[in-house]
């Protein structure tokens, strides 16, 4: 099993370096034709403005992008990672070679806009369940190649990461259950790999399946597309199972920001939201240059 990504500062910095290198290769390839009109040694100052209120996220990616083009660039953040910034606020000042800043501009802003969008949306969802036991959890519905960056943004916005990929945890879904011959049979079948997994979770669609999962020793159960009365009954059944049989309960399916609080008030532990990383509204940032 590949190790579960730990999101430590060094690991995030290395991830940002790799993502930035790949993005710059995609955008610049063998040279920025337009930036070549600027004299190689000319210096410039740039500032990045938020055009709307947001939770800022993506500083490691911005810095990696800029410094791969100008290792000596000076970067000063005026809004910290995970902090709320206001519309028209200057969030960042950069000083470096004009060519490097011009070439880095779009790639750096792409990272900042995307990751701030994820963090901002996650914060809105996390705020909506504040005061309940529920935590907001992400999914694997991410942009190809940017999963770890998006999951970092979810954490920055106050959410919790579910499994990183298929390699680090077990999620038994309806097709697995059908193939195995039932919930209990599916749980028995994954026992040989359970020790290698960060967790084992089983998806259920009915209260009968929930009871079967609890009796089989499931420690995490995903309640899929249940209506409110059924969810409340599921929480009651789980509570009555006793401390040694009780599972962590997670909701998935049809989750909206408007209905989130009602779901959280049922007493579930986790609410998974694919929209955090799948339906992202990028935050509007712009970069303005001043000749240095």
Please tell me what each predicted stretch does.
Residues 2-216, 220, 232-237, 250, ...:
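Acidic/glycine-rich phosphate/pyrophosphate-binding loops and surrounding catalytic core
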Residues 222, 226-228:
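Extended hydrophobic secondary-structure segments
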Residues 225, 253, 274-275:
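Short secondary-structure boundary segments
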Residues 238-242:
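Conserved hydrophobic residues forming the short capping helix/wall of the S-adenosyl-L-methionine
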């Amino acid at each position: 099993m590949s190790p579960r990504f730990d999101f430590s500062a060094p690991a995030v910095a290395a991830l940002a370096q790799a993502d930035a290198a790949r993005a710059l290769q995609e955008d610049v390839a063998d040279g920025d034709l337009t930036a070549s009109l600027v004299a190689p040694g000319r210096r410039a100052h740039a500032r990045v403005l938020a055009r709307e209120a947001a939770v800022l996220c993506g500083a490691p990616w911005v810095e990696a992008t800029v410094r791969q083009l100008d290792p000596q660039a000076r970067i000063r953040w005026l809004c910290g990672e995970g902090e709320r910034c206001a519309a028209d606020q200057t969030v960042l000042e950069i000083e470096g070679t004009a060519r490097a800043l011009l070439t880095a501009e779009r790639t750096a802003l792409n990272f900042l806009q995307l990751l701030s969008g994820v963090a901002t949306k996650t914060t809105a969802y996390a705020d909506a369940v504040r005061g309940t036991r529920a935590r907001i959890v992400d999914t694997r519905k991410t942009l190809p190649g940017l999963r770890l960056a998006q999951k970092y943004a979810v954490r920055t916005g106050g959410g919790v990461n579910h499994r990183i990929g298929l390699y680090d945890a077990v999620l038994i879904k309806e097709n697995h259950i059908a193939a195995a011959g039932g919930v209990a049979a599916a749980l028995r079948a994954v026992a040989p790999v359970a020790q290698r997994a960060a967790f084992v979770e089983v998806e259920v669609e009915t209260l009968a399946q929930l009871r079967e999962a609890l009796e089989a020793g499931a420690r995490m159960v995903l309640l899929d597309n249940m209506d409110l009365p059924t969810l409340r009954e599921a929480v009651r059944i789980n509570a009555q199972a006793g401390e040694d049989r009780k599972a962590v309960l997670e909701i998935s399916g049809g989750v909206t920001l408007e209905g989130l609080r009602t779901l959280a008030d049922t007493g579930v532990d986790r609410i998974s939201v694919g929209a955090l990383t799948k339906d992202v509204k990028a935050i509007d940032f712009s970069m303005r240059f001043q000749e240095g």
